[in-house]
């Protein structure tokens, strides 16, 4: 037993030793304050316990002193709770003393869970309470386990002084699970925990209400996926940490957000981590939640404008937390949903860019630091902006319906964005001129986008604009100039109809209707005979109809019946039809009876005292024969005789007895009534009988007689006589000059005068008679020889005249005015009427601007002859004016210079200084003159307003020049120098000039001719601000439009600079065509109310004078039908020195005026083209001509004749094989010389540079390449930067027209490589694209060229059958230029010979450009310009007509 008892005791001890906790490392070391090993009473360590429910509490156990019998209790000294018999959830607390630590430390402890049934006795929680605050939730816990011994745990608490904390152990019982929970060996170590992570300091977080607060927990230690992290609130609420990020192997971080913070969210938070080795706890950080501020009062309104509001924010009194770091103004329309905010950085704030007449709601926003720091908007200020001026006037105003008496306008609808006010008015203002009086009217428009003006006059040019106005201002639309449609015209004024009757003609003239209601196109005159004085007259055929063109308000009716009253009904027509007719009656004069023919035989019978003749009845003409008379005339040989063609009939009846008393050579032998001579019957002269009071005495056998028979008609106070010599008796001398039976001249007026009494002749003897006979024969021979010589000379002169005038044509006035004109020729009618060659019932052939038949007009004197005469004008005397009709002949004769020509006439002009120029010579003004000898005369100089402090600032080298009936119409000045640019603009403003004409380039032949005095954008010259608005480049001139404003003035003026760029450096232009178009453009665009036109070249003399002289003479030719160039230049030079400076310029002025008169103004506005096209293309059935045909004939006349010296290069032998025809050679001055080198090949190609309407040298016109010129062709394309090639002919090997481009590959043509890129076919067009480069100069790169082959033009036709397809070529060309070469590349155009087809295409392109740029169509001018450089451009009338037709088609496509 003893041995067994001892053995049992030993086993018990061993068991107790197993339950005892193992010794801790360093367990014997001294623990810091707060630690406790429980070897002594726990109170000695500062620990305390709190009594739990029903006495459930911690107990200190020391099994060494008091062994425990329950084997589940460990051995040693420790704190323990017994959960046996306890209800679930009972808690017992062990409180450690309060700790204040300054550095990193660690609390570790051991815990023990045991039970008899191996079930968990409950839970152990550890709390860390900071600064005496709430206990919160546990930071560490263990439950549901039974330990196999003591287990160590660590607490890494990061709460430091001055804060303090307390650790609380809490045990929680679990019902039905008896057992023990023990804690022992609590230590506070002065080093980091080995396993539990330590937190770095957690920072306070400040947020604004509603924002998410984010805490970042940073811990030192290793992170494990099994670790648990959370954010613990002061009151115990836990929030899981959302994001964990490993910083490095010894540090990691985690973040957690507190969402949607509010004032209730204000608290303290700390980070807690639970790992396998224990827990880490951070310090508490505060979550501070601020209330964003908001103002108490609304903003204060200080000022109101149309687009702004001045406010005072009133942000001093707020609700919420400061500080305020930002003030903002929030505004919105009261009806809108959008809002904008502006930052306010001053006590007052101006809201900009507001909409006018809009109600706004304005609030103030205040912002404090932090996200979400902007408070709610403060109370609103509600106010409305003022109205503003409209943004612009009505736009895209157009006329959508034009009628004779009304117009319908349409414009782009606009709303508030344009009116800038909700209350506005829209008004249409219009004005027109009627009967030389200007009318203005306006109407208020109620509709939104269209309106019809009613009650207008037909064909009235109306200037109208729309006016948009509101309470603050008004804006106008662009002015529209529109013409109402034509209507039928009113009646021709009856009182204006005047008639000039003749025997078989009636000249009638009238005035246009007072209300033309359009362009009078035709007058219709219906005429018919309504009665005759001659009962036998057959009037059935005396009727007809005549049409007259608008500029012919007169007509000569021929082929009428004498003595007949005609009814004339005249009515005028416009394109709309004929107006009401008006009728008048005019009677022709009676005509002398028509005498029958008599044979030159001897009389029926003759005795010594009688002679028997045969009398035949006369045929009445307009009035019955009143009486027949037999007249016997004695032929006295000693008296001189008049020529037969001026012998008159015998109007004064003289009886035989009175003849003796009056010494009359004739007497009336008989007077017979018509009833006495119903048929032919014989009559014996000298039968000694009396007939109706006249004695027929016997004839004297010693005298010679002529027997005359005359018939007389009387009616309405007119007496007309016709007579015939029937026979002679006694063979009177000189009778051979007149054959018996020949009718004599007619007496055109009634005569009742008495002859003066003459003393009777005495008889002479036969010797004297014989002498008279001999003298008469001699005289007859002399006269006959003189007549023959005269006739021969006239025939020679006529032949020479016809040769000389072969190229002449009739010249009418420059514009369509009814001025008297006449054909050039030697035949002139000495009567008061010049008769037209037209048919009675036909149209007079005419064209716009000129008459191809002379206009009929009443004259009291004959036209002066135009036969060539020797002109000899003395020097220094005025020369006579030249009629427009005579100008061609005059210039031709003056150029011949036979005795007196242009050289002598020019030298007769005053040269050099002719007046004082003292002001210009002053020292202060010398540097203002470009040339010392071209300066301003004192009497005509422009005086500028004197600037303050500079008495010489009134001088500028400029003179006033008078125009045609317009004083000071021009200012001639020098090209501005750098020193005078400001003075130049002062002059422009002072004189209110709207046009500057510049006839020089800035630099010519390397010398500065004029400085650039205009800006590219905006420039200020002194106190004048000049702004460039638009630049319109054309082939021969450029039009720049500026606005000009002077400082201190509100007025803004528009100014145009017309810059003629084509005047050559030397001499004068080859042709005046371009300059004439330039002059017309200046005249058209210069406002009538503007000040003088400022004209300058370099010196302001030569070219300046040419422009002014041409413009002035064109006005004179238009208004007077004459030109007076000599005296015009003479007057110009009296106002400025040496205007028109050289003889060459003087001749050029003549040539320009001649071309203007020959060609006229053929431009047609686009708006009138459709209506006028019918008239100008209509074929007159009488003349088989049209105005287009007349234009083309004129074009052929004025086309320059090519001389061999003009195309000398093409005529060189080495170039012969490069020309298809030696008849079609390019002019030397138009040649594009090849630049690329190709071996020994010359630089010549049969091509010519041609201008388009708006680009100089835009076209290169050439022939289809020959086999030996293909390389030259591609050199041309490359050298002249040609981006397009247009081919207008078919390929034909018979004519050596082969393909000259590669197909689907590349090829080399001389130095040029041509590479095929693509091709497509579009109806009649094959479109190819090539890439070309010069292989000899690869550094120049390659170029893209399009090739347009037009296959819709058959070889046998002058024109293509389709206008639309050719227009498609033009449009493709335009599109390519816009997209690929920026309109800088040229276009090669070729047909077979580079003539008709090429010219037609170039003309069509230019017409399209003209329509786009200037809204006019002038086919004549375009073709004339092309022919100036190549005479075979547009070769046939059909091609010329085709250009017109394509223009019409082009307009129809819009």
Swiss-Prot record:
Composition bias, Polar residues: 824-841
Enzyme kind, highest EC tier: hydrolase
Function recorded in the entry: May be involved in both signal transduction and cellular adhesion in the CNS. May have specific signaling roles in the tyrosine phosphorylation/dephosphorylation pathway in the anterior compartment of the adult cerebellar cortex.
Active site, per annotation: 1097 (phosphocysteine intermediate), 1391 (phosphocysteine intermediate)
A cellular component term, taken from the record's GO annotations: plasma membrane
Listed name of the protein: Receptor-type tyrosine-protein phosphatase T
One Pfam match: MAM
Any one GO biological process: negative regulation of receptor signaling pathway via STAT
Residues at which substrate binds: 1065, 1097-1103, 1141
Signal peptide location: 1-29
Tissue specificity: Expression is restricted to the CNS. Distributed throughout the brain and spinal cord.
Tyrosine-protein phosphatase domain mapped to chain residues: 902-1156, 1188-1450
Transmembrane domains' residue ranges: 771-791
Subcellular location field: Membrane
Domain MAM: 34-195
Cytoplasmic topology ranges: 792-1454
Matches recorded under CDD domains: FN3 (cd00063), MAM (cd06263), R-PTPc-T-1 (cd14630), R-PTPc-T-2 (cd14634)
Keyword Transport: no
Membrane topology: Single-pass type I membrane protein
Glycosylation sites: 82, 102, 141, 212, 425, 514, 551, 605, 658, 688
């Amino acid at each position: 037993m003893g041995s067994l008892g001892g053995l049992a005791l030993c086993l018990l001890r061993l068991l107790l030793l197993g339950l005892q906790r193992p010794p801790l490392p360093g367990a014997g070391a001294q623990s810091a304050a707060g630690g406790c090993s429980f070897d002594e009473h726990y109170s000695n360590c500062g620990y305390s316990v709190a009594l739990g429910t029903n006495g459930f509490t911690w107990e200190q156990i020391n099994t060494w002193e008091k062994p425990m019998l329950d084997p589940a209790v460990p051995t040693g000294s420790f704190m323990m709770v017994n959960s046996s018999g306890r209800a679930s959830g009972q808690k017992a607390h062990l409180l450690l003393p309060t700790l204040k630590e300054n550095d990193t430390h660690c609390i570790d402890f051991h815990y023990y869970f045991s039970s008899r049934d191996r079930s968990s006795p409950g839970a152990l929680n550890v709390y860390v309470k900071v600064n005496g605050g709430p206990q919160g939730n546990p930071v560490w816990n263990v439950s549901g386990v039974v330990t196999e011994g003591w287990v160590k745990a660590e607490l890494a608490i990061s709460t430091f002084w001055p804060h303090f904390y307390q650790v609380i152990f809490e045990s929680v019982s679990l019902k039905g699970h008896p057992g023990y929970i023990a804690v022992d060996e609590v230590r506070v170590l002065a080093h980091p925990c080995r396993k539990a992570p330590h937190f770095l300091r957690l920072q306070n977080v400040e947020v604004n209400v509603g924002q998410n607060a984010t805490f970042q927990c940073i811990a030192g230690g290793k992170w494990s996926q099994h670790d648990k992290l959370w954010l613990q609130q002061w009151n115990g609420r836990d929030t899981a940490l959302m994001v964990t990020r490993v910083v490095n192997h010894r540090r990691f971080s985690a973040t957690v957000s507190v969402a949607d913070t509010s004032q209730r969210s204000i608290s303290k938070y700390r980070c807690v981590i639970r790992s396998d080795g224990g827990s880490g706890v951070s310090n508490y950080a505060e979550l501070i939640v601020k209330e964003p501020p908001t103002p108490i009062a609304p903003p204060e309104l200080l000022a109101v404008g149309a687009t702004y509001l001045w406010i005072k924010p009133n942000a001093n009194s707020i609700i919420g937390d400061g500080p305020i770091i930002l003030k903002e103004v929030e505004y919105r329309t009261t009806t809108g949903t959008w809002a904008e905010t502006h930052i306010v950085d001053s006590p007052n704030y101006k809201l900009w860019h507001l909409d006018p007449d809009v109600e706004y709601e304005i609030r103030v926003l205040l912002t404090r630091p932090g996200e979400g720091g902007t408070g709610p908007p403060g109370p609103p200020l509600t106010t409305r902006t003022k109205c503003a001026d409209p943004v612009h006037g009505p736009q895209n105003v157009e006329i959508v319906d034009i009628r004779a008496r009304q117009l319908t306008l349409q414009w782009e609808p606009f709303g508030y964005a344009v009116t800038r006010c909700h209350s506005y008015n829209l008004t249409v203002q219009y004005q027109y001129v009627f009967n030389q009086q200007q009318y203005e009217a306006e109407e208020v428009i109620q509709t939104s986008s269209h309106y019809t003006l009613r009650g207008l006059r037909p064909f009235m040019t109306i200037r109208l604009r729309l006016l948009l106005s509101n309470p603050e201002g008004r804006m106008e639309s662009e002015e529209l100039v529109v013409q109402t449609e034509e209507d039928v015209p009113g009646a021709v004024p009856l009182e204006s109809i005047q008639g000039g009757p003749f025997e078989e003609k009636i000249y009638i003239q009238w005035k246009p209707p007072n209300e033309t209601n359009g362009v009078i196109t035709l007058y219709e005159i219906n005429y018919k005979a309504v009665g005759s004085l001659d009962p036998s007259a057959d009037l059935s055929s005396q009727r007809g109809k005549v049409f007259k063109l608008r500029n012919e308000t007169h007509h000569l009716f021929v082929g009428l019946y004498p003595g007949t009253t005609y009814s004339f009904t005249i009515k005028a027509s416009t394109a709309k039809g004929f107006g009401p007719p008006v009728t008048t009656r005019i009677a022709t004069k009676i005509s002398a009876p028509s005498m029958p023919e008599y044979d030159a035989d001897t009389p029926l019978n003759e005795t010594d005292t009688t002679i028997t003749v045969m009398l035949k009845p006369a045929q009445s003409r307009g009035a019955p024969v009143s009486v027949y008379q037999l007249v016997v005339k004695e032929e006295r040989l000693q008296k001189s005789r008049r020529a037969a063609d001026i012998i008159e009939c015998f109007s004064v009846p003289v009886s035989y007895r009175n003849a003796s008393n009056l010494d009359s050579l004739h007497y009336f032998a008989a007077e017979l009534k018509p009833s006495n001579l119903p048929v032919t019957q014989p009559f014996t002269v000298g039968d000694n009988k009396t007939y109706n009071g006249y004695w027929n005495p016997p004839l004297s056998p010693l005298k010679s007689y002529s027997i005359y028979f005359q018939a007389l008609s009387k009616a309405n106070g007119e007496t007309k006589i016709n007579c015939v010599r029937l026979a002679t008796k006694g063979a009177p001398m000189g009778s051979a000059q007149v054959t018996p039976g020949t009718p004599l001249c007619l007496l055109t007026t009634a005569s009742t005068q008495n002859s003066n009494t003459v003393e009777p002749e005495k008889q002479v003897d036969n010797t004297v008679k014989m002498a008279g006979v001999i003298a008469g024969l001699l005289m007859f021979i002399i006269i006959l020889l003189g007549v023959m010589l005269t006739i021969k000379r006239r025939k020679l002169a006529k032949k020479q005249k016809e040769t000389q005038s072969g190229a002449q044509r009739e010249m009418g006035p420059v514009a369509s005015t009814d001025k008297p004109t006449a054909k050039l020729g030697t035949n002139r009618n000495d009567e008061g009427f010049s008769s037209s060659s037209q048919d009675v019932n036909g149209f007079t052939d005419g064209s716009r601007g000129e008459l191809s038949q002379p206009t009929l007009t009443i004259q009291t004197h004959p036209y002066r002859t135009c036969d060539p005469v020797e002109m000899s004008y003395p020097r220094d005397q005025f020369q006579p004016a030249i009629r427009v009709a005579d100008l061609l002949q005059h210039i031709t004769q003056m150029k011949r210079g036979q005795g007196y020509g242009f050289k002598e006439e020019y030298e007769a002009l005053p040269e050099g200084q002719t007046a004082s120029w003292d002001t210009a010579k002053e020292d202060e003004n010398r540097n203002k003159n470009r040339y010392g000898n071209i300066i301003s005369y004192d009497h005509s100089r422009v005086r500028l307003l004197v600037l303050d402090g500079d008495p010489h600032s009134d001088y500028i080298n400029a003179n006033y020049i008078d125009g045609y009936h317009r004083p000071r119409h021009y200012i001639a000045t020098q090209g501005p120098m750098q020193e005078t640019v400001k003075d130049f603009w002062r002059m422009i403003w002072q004189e209110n000039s709207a046009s500057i004409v510049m006839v020089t380039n800035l630099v010519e032949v390397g010398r500065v001719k004029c400085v650039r005095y205009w800006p590219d954008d905006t420039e200020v010259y002194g106190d004048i601000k000049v702004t460039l608005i638009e630049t319109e480049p054309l082939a021969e001139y450029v039009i720049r439009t500026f606005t000009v404003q002077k400082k201190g003035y509100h007025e803004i003026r528009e100014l145009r600079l017309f810059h003629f760029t084509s005047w050559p450096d030397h001499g004068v232009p080859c042709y005046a065509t371009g300059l004439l178009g330039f002059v017309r453009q200046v005249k058209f665009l210069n406002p009538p109310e503007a000040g003088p036109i400022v004209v300058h070249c370099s010196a302001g003399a030569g070219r300046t004078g040419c422009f002014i002289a041409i413009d002035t003479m064109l006005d004179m030719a238009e208004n007077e039908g004459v030109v007076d160039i000599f005296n015009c230049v003479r007057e110009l030079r009296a106002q400025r020195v040496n205007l028109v400076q050289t003889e060459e310029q003087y001749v050029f002025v003549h040539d320009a005026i001649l071309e203007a008169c020959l060609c006229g103004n053929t431009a047609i506005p686009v708006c009138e083209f459709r209506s006028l096209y019918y008239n100008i293309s209509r074929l007159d059935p009488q003349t088989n001509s049209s105005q287009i045909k007349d234009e083309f004939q004129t074009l052929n006349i004025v086309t320059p004749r090519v001389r061999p010296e003009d195309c000398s290069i093409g005529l060189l032998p080495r170039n012969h094989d490069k020309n298809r025809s030696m008849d079609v050679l390019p002019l030397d001055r138009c040649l594009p010389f090849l630049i690329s080198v190709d071996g020994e090949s010359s630089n010549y190609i049969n091509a010519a540079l041609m201008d388009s309407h708006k680009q100089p040298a835009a076209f290169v016109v050439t022939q289809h390449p020959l086999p030996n010129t293909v390389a030259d062709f591609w050199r041309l394309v490359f050298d002249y930067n040609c981006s397009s090639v247009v081919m207008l002919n078919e390929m034909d090997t018979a004519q050596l027209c082969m393909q000259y481009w590669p197909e689907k590959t590349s090829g080399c043509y001389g130095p040029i490589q041509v590479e095929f890129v693509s091709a497509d076919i579009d109806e009649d067009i094959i479109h190819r694209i090539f890439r070309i480069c010069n292989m000899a100069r690869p550094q120049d790169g390659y170029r893209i060229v399009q090739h347009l082959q037009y296959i819709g033009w058959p070889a046998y036709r002058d024109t293509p059958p389709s206008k639309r397809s050719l227009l498609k070529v033009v449009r493709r060309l335009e599109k390519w230029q816009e997209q690929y070469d920026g309109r800088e590349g040229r276009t090669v155009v070729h047909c077979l010979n580079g003539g008709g087809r090429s010219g037609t295409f170039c003309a069509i392109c230019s017409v399209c450009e003209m329509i786009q740029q200037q809204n006019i169509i002038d086919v004549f001018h375009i073709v004339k310009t092309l022919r100036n450089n190549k005479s075979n451009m547009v070769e046939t009338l059909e091609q010329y007509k085709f250009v017109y037709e394509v223009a019409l088609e082009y307009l129809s496509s819009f």
